[in-house]
Curated annotation (Swiss-Prot):
GO terms for molecular function: rRNA binding; structural constituent of ribosome; tRNA binding. Gene3D superfamilies: 1.10.8.50, 30s ribosomal protein s13, domain 2. Residues 98-122 are annotated as: Disordered. PANTHER family: 30S RIBOSOMAL PROTEIN S13/40S RIBOSOMAL PROTEIN S18 (PTHR10871), SMALL RIBOSOMAL SUBUNIT PROTEIN US13M (PTHR10871:SF1). The gene is rpsM. InterPro entries: Rbsml_uS13_C, Ribosomal_uS13, Ribosomal_uS13-like_H2TH, Ribosomal_uS13_bac-type, Ribosomal_uS13_CS. Signal peptide: none annotated. SUPFAM superfamilies: S13-like H2TH domain (SSF46946). This is Small ribosomal subunit protein uS13. One of its GO terms (cellular component) is cytosol. Coiled coil: none annotated.
Amino acid sequence: MARIAGIDLPKKKKIEYALPYIYGIGLTTSRKILKDTGIDPEKRVYELTEDEVSILNKEIQSNYIVEGELRKIVQLNIKELMDLGCYRGLRHRRGLPVRGQRTKTNARTRKGKRKTVGAKAK
């Protein structure tokens, strides 16, 4: 099993589709990495040689921010928005949708389970 950027890639998948298992690498980036390194995208992960794995590792480590480092940067960006007190930061703080979605109905994923409100007494 090839271990790239601290992630074990699935053996039987083509390398082109296995690289996106790494946080921060999508299909487009995966294709770009393979083109830059000259590795055949049709190759399966178990077919990679040690040299190819090390080339991929070097390429990703030197040119891309992935996994834990990227997660930390994203969290810091969200924290900065919250500290600034801007609209997006307030939405993050309140646990509501950030990108302008409606909240009268829907938004259950972001808001969590429904809170039952008692009926008013007359």
